[in-house]
């Protein structure tokens, strides 16, 4: 699991 996915999902939602 990539670490940037966390903040990325937060920005997308």
Swiss-Prot record:
It is found in: Secreted. Expressed by the venom gland. The modification Threonine amide is found at residue 13. GO terms for biological process: chemotaxis. The keyword Nucleus does not apply. GO terms for molecular function: toxin activity. Keywords: Amidation, Chemotaxis, G-protein coupled receptor impairing toxin, Mast cell degranulation, Secreted, Toxin. Signal peptide: none annotated. GO terms for cellular component: extracellular region. Its main location: secreted. Belongs to the MCD family. Protonectin subfamily. Mast cell degranulating peptide. Induces the chemotaxis of neutrophils. Its mast cell degranulation activity may be related to the activation of G-protein coupled receptors in mast cells as well as interaction with other proteins located in cell endosomal membranes in the mast cells. This is Chemotactic peptide.
């Amino acid at each position: 699991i990539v670490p940037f996915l966390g903040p990325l999902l937060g920005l997308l939602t």
